[in-house]
Structures are given as C-alpha cells and as structure tokens.
Amino acid sequence: MGHPSGQNATASIGWRVHAFRFLVYFTGLFAAALAPWVNRTFGSPTIEQVLYHLRFAEGAALEMSEVFVSTFLVEVLLAALILAGIASALHTVLEQGRGLWRARGARALPPLVVGGGLTMLLMQFSAFSWAAAHFEKDRFAQSYLDPAAVALMEGKRRNLILIYVESLEETYSDQALFGADLLAPLRTVGGRSLPAYRAAPGATWTIAALVATQCGIPLTVYDDDIRSVKAERTFLRGATCLGDILQARGYRNVFMGGAPLSFSGKGEFLQDHGYEERWGKKKWLDAGARPPGTPDPEMGGWGMYDDALLERARARLAELHAEGQPFNLTLLTLDTHNPNGYLSPRCRRDAVNGSEEAFRAIVGCTSAQLARFVRFVRDEGYLKDTTLVIIGDHPAVGNPVDAKLRSVADRRVFNLFVGAQPFPAHVQPLVSFDMFPTLLEITGARAPDGRLGLGRSAWAPDTSPSAWVLHPNLPALAGSAAYQRLWSGNPG
C-alpha cells in the first residue's frame, strides 16, 4: 500500500500537468480563433495600427468596445475554452492508449496547436512582412515630396466643404447584392466622380485615411523618444498638410465630427494642422445636443447621428459663408461604422428587421441625408465660390453586410465632387494620397507638376504614381529616417 504523502504528491503533479496542458492548448486555440475574428471585425490591421491605437486611444475606445465584446466572448474566448477542453481530453486518450504512434501523437499535438495558432495570428497582423521590411531600402525617402519645399501656383480661391463618410464604398450601389442601389439618392444631385478611387496602402482606418488624404502620407507607429509631450505640436509636427497650407493662405479650418475627438489622436492631428475650430462628441454634449435616452435624441452611443451632424453643419456653413473669409469645412460622419452602425431615430422604418436590413437602412439614410445637404448647398447658391467633396474614408469592414462586400473583387471608395471643374478625359486610378494635391487644387493652389507628398492631382493625367505607391511597404516606414522626421520635426 502506497504512502499517503506519495499519493498526494503524485496527484498534485498530475493535476499540474493537466492544467499546464490545458493552458498550452488554450493558448494555441485562442490565437487560432482570434485571427479570423480580427479579420472579420477589423479587416487586416498591421502591427503599426495596433500599436498606434494603444498609444493614442486615450480611453475613448471604451465607449465603443461593448459592441465587440459579445462576439469576442463567444467566437474567441468561449470557443477556445471548449476546444482546449476537447483537445486536453483527446490528449489524455492518446496518452493512455497503447502503441508508439499514440504516444508520439500525444507529444506532437501541443506544439502543433500552439505553433499553428500563433502562426495564424502573426500572419493576420503581417508580422513576418513587418520583420523583413526593416532590411529594405528607404523607398519613402525616394518618393516623398515635401509640400513645404514646393512653390504652389496660386489661382482663384474657392471655399471647400469636405465630407468624410464612414466606410462608404461604391459597392453599396450593387443592386445584385443588395436588391437596390443604397446610394441612389446621391446619384440624383449632379457632380462628378473619379472612376477608380481606392484606399491607399495602410489607409483603411479612419485616422490613417485622414492623414493620407490631407497629408499625402501613410500613418504608422512612431518612437516615443521623437514625440515629446511637451512639444507645441505633437502629431506629425514635421509634416505639412492640407489644413496647414489653407491656414497659411488665410482660410478658416473648421472640423465637425460626431465621434469623440480623443479617439485615435484625431483631435491632436486636427489641432496641430490648422483646424482652429473642432467639434466632437463632448463639445456637442456641452453645447446642448440631446443625449441618448431623451426625446428625439441627437446623440447615439458613439456620438452624434449623421442627420443631426449635417443639420448643425448647415447652420455653421451659413455663418462661415456670410463672414466672407475663405473656409474649409470638414465633416466626418459615423452612422455607418462597424459592427452594426447607428440608426438615427429619425431614419427608422417599421419594416426594419434583423441586423442586415437595419444596416441597409442606415446606409440608405446617410445617403439620403447627404443628398439633402448637397441640394441645400446648391439651392443657397454656395457653389458659386465653394466646392463640395464627399468621399468615403475607407472601405467597410466587419459590418452586417461584410460577406456581400467581400464577394466583390474590386472595391472602390465612394467619391463625389460637386462644383469642381471637369476631370481629364482619361483619369488614372487614384488612391487616398492623391486626394491631398487634388483637394488643394480645388481651392485654387496647384503644385507645378500636380505632385505633393506621395500623391498626384486628379488634374495631372500624365503624372505617374510615386515609387512608394507602386511598391508600398508599410512596415519599412518604421526604419525610414525621412518618415521619422515627420514625427520629430527635425529636418536633420
């Protein structure tokens, strides 16, 4: 008969082995479940994007995080726990069975599961490309044209109304996918569109899209030692962007967005690049916007509904135009944000059932509200000295109609120019970086060859894409001295 203490020790060791084995399986299966969940929910974020948001989120993301928690708990955490339990039980069966192949199978299973899961997760974040890119040449330095070093040709100044529409892409017009053209209201207001406008590499999230279209550069992570919190300008303080140039030309830059300004450093970017007036969720609430839970609310969980934002923008536009100073009024909507969007009470339909139908209603409502805004601008006579540009910030991801959107191979970003001069007969395919010199040219300032940053103007048909756009490498930016200087502001 064995000694009790020996039996207890054996049982304790056995329990620890089983617990460790479960933890190993859980780690691998958690990583394997996390990778497709991230892809469905956020697309294909890079390591830079993840690190960037960890540094700049400032807690505002918590206001929206609850919408992702339920799917994460079920599709990742619970699934990994259940599968780890099954794998641990299978391991025990193999271990207790007879035969060499069973013993080898039991030993090989844990490293295979962990290695496979971690590999899937690393591939989801392009980790291998990120590591390899640090050994490549600095193609950004070869391609970037500093706007501060370019003598712009000044023409007649025009005001600019620039509307970024959250995740709006041309695919929503596909009647075969959605049973109707969800953007039909915007097809009735006139204007012209670029035939092939796509998100630039890395510009598939909102703040990166703002930087790409207003500065002509990608957005990636920076080193802490080059971004001093005591500096007067902290967000890309070495870059010259749309707001900087317009401010120097005597424009008043006004930003009106529904979401918190603190999220992803958006407020810092705007403040540091010429936007004297900035409206976001907190400022709207402080100004008396009707919060959730009140009759006819103007605010949802993440911020101001699009119809309320556009109503406020109409009033501010009238004031700006009456003042006589050239202006740039930039708006950023939010109702079409993933994962489920935000349906304004003034847009609800009794027939809305299910998340997909509700999301189609959201897209249709935002489209109708934008069309109404365009008609207001035209009816008030503002187009005589003002150009209105409506663009999606980036393609959609992780919403209720994501599967339908992904079934389309060529996903183009929505764009509409109202009051702009005609485009050349043959406009080359353009990306987000190209919007920077294009927007400047709309206001009357043109680069001699139409090129600024990494972009080229839509009215420069013979200008070829930059080398970086032709062969983009986002991970290599982390090692680019030229790119780091845009954060440090140090010309050396």
Question: Where is each model-derived feature located?
Answer:
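Alpha-helical transmembrane signal-anchor/signal-peptide segments
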Residues: 128-144
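Transmembrane and membrane-interface helices of multi-pass
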Residues: 1-133
